[in-house]
Amino acid sequence: MEEFKRYLELDRXQQHDFIYPLIFQEYIYALAHDRGLNKSIFFENADYDNKSSLLIVKRLITHLITQMYQQNHFFFYTNDFNPNKFLGYNTNLYSQMIFEGFVVVVEIPFYLRLLSFLEGKDREXLIXLXSLHSIFPFLEDKFSHLNYILDILIPHPVHLEILXQTLRYWVKDPSSLHLLXFFLHEYSNWNSLITPKKYSSSFSKRNQKFFLFLYNFHVCEYESIFVFLRNQSSHLCSISFETFLERILFYKKIELEIFVKDFKAILWVFKDPLLHYVRYRGKSILASKGSSLLMDKWKYYVVNFWECYFYIWAQPRRIHINQLSNNSLDFLGYLSSIRLKPSMVRSQMIENSFLIENASKKFDTLVPITPMIESLSKAKFCNVLGQPMSKPVWGGLSDSDIIERFGRIYRNLSHYYSGSLKKITLYRIKYILRLSCARTLARKHKSTVRSFLKRLGVGLLEEFFTEEEQVFYLTFPKASSTSRKLYQRRIWYLDIFCINDTANHE
């Protein structure tokens, strides 16, 4: 990393190709390999697979560029998906290395910006803010004062070349951009209509880091316009997303006088002191205290912004305007809503007393039962009606492993949905998983569920599935000592960085 810093901190005016030469450095692929093993960013360990060869990677890049100019495409272009050979080596293996190495190289400038942003800040607090549950206290604090939300599904680019064009604003390196364009061109050829879908799925799975980086960067470009408008507002001063506003150009070359004239009108329309934006993956929420007319203007602006500056067919039906008082918000697996909580206040004036009825807004979160049943049904724990089923694919495991898997799934779900006060959905999920576990064990031992539980003892499964309540107590020692009262509390954890999917526990 220090070598990257010394290279990238040179005078930018002297760097004609400040990224492209790094692709030919051997430690880049060592970092890419270590990152694939450790699931982390920029490890110092330089050991990597002996099957990888820097010389082959260099020759393959040169050969790819030569083929690009000769218009003789061979990269990932087979019908039977047999590995192509280049100098006796597997081109699919080394092309994947180039993809991973390219991602590491392009991420370096952004990583250095992140390090400079973190200087002097509490990193532990910033890491805790990355938890999915950290969003809900923010919603609970802000949304009770708002009226309308825009429920937005972020569209995907029409063509992969748009991703490369968006990257031009950050990466001033023609050679690297040409190489990226060639990768995307070969992918689009290989992923044509006549190519079976399973091949493209395999390709995208093997290069998830590459396309995930491009997609995340593309989404950040969407979001930067909201930050820009927020910073320009006279009512607000944003402290977030500072690194996304340091571009030389703003999306597109526009004549200055026209841009200034139009932009003042935009600021006049959208000058809103209570405008909040939240996103997770491909779904985002834009909330405001304004009227429905203001939200219609926001919807019109977002659609036109996507179509004009990103060349995306932004279907208006992907953006829904909902009133918080009348609609629930389906976000991050919770059904969130604003409900009125009535209260009575007795007022005394001299000899007369009377009651005043008052209603306050309260942010409420529920666990939706239908998506949970669908997820369990997809994972073969129950049928579509929620009736528990055995899991025969786990029949070859030991009894302790089977019980541990079922218990871990329930504890993960209970841990994630601890923010809901009404636990009736979790009680039903617990019933489905316990009975599915019992049926799996009974089928393995060729017995009935009743006789197996009688021999095993119901208390064993009950104790294993209620282990998560002890975790709650240890995590929050100031809470009530009774597990029942503790289980009814709303708890938001700061260690959840992804949604646990029961279908992935195969």
Swiss-Prot record:
Statement: the UniProt record of this protein carries the keyword Amino-acid biosynthesis: no
TM spans (from-to): none
InterPro entries: Domain_X, Maturase_MatK, Maturase_MatK_N
Principal subcellular localization: plastid
Pfam families xref list: Intron_maturas2 (PF01348), MatK_N (PF01824)
Keywords: Chloroplast, mRNA processing, Plastid, RNA-binding, tRNA processing
GO CC field: chloroplast
GO biological process, one term: mRNA processing
Coiled coil: none
A GO molecular-function annotation: RNA binding
Domain of life: Eukaryota
Annotated function: Usually encoded in the trnK tRNA gene intron. Probably assists in splicing its own and other chloroplast group II introns.
Similarity comment: family membership: Belongs to the intron maturase 2 family. MatK subfamily.
HAMAP family: MatK
The protein's name: Maturase K
Lineage: Eukaryota, Viridiplantae, Streptophyta, Embryophyta, Tracheophyta
Gene name linked to the record: matK
